[in-house]
Structure formats: C-alpha cells, structure tokens
Amino acid sequence: MYDYRRMTLQERREVVRERHARGFPLHAPPHFRGVTGDYLITAACFEHRPVFAQPPDLSWLLDETVNAFIEAEIPCRAWVFLPNHYHLVLHTEDMGIMSEIIRLLHSRVATEINGRHHRRGRRVWYRFSDRLIRSERHHWATVNYLHYNAVKHGYVDQMTAWPWSSIHEYLEDRGEAEVLRMWREYPVGDYGRGWDW
C-alpha cells in the first residue's frame, strides 16, 4: 500500500500514467460499481498506526462496523479486526451504497476514537480497498485468510485465541470438523502477499 513512497520519481509517474490510462483514480484504490457479489473489504489505519491497540477500542470498532452493515441489510459473511486494519467479506448489490456506509462509518469512528484518545484532528483512516470474490474457492480461501490474519501478523499463535474474528461464529455454526475441512480444502498459502504483509 505504501510502496509509492519508496518509488523513484520516474516509477511514480509511470504508476500515475497507467492508472490514468485505465480510468482509475490517480492516488486511490478504484471501486467498481454495478457488480453484485461478495467483496473482500480491507481498511487500514493511516500509515498502519495501531489506533485500536486497546481491547475495548477494538471491541467497539468491531461492534460499530458490523452493526453499520446489519442496519443497511448488507450481509457480513466474515471479519477480522486488528489494531491497525480490518478485513470484511460482505455481500452487496451496490458498491456505491457500501462505499457510502464505509465513508460515514470511518468519519464517525475517527471522531469518537480521537475524542477517547484526546487526539482531535488526528487522521485515523487511509482508504479502503474492495476486491470482488470471483469463485467459491476464492470465497473460502478469503474467509480462511481472515480467520488466520491475527496469527499471520503475530498477535496470537492460534486463530481461536483472537476474539475479534468471525472464526468463533464459524465454529459455533458449522462445527470444528467442518471448519477444519474448509481449512484443508481452501488453504491460505501466500494469500495477501503484496498487499497485507
């Protein structure tokens, strides 16, 4: 995400030229409209700062985020929340509506968390990215990746040790045997390399 800062001036110009040619925003992730489906949403704190490092703040962020999508009747299929970013799998018919929900959510969350931390005006969020999930295999590999994310980033040794993840609901709803079967059938491998490392 922050590779742009490490690029030479010529490399930066080439990236901007390519994004312009593809019709993408010059310095932001593109958000595609009009495609119904499940999406992986990734939102990172500005410069990956651990704004939500305290457990009560992380619990509050999870509740605020999941409830915002429940209220909008957008199914949240999986999630993980970490101190400096989160991932969701959501189903939507209109990416424009989902983008607006995230924009309003991030504004509200930033105002509240900055008030709690006595840091008015601090930039909390960078932007969010979305990726259309293209197949059942992609869906389950993404869900497994989300559930493994806290282990990958070194917060815990086991997925079930991280309370801010939908792994607990998956275990309750599907049972341990089914979750383990999905883990074996849809391995994470190097999923996330280049954008969540």
Regions found by a protein language model. Name each.
Residues 1-197:
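Short catalytic/metal-binding and nucleic-acid-binding patches
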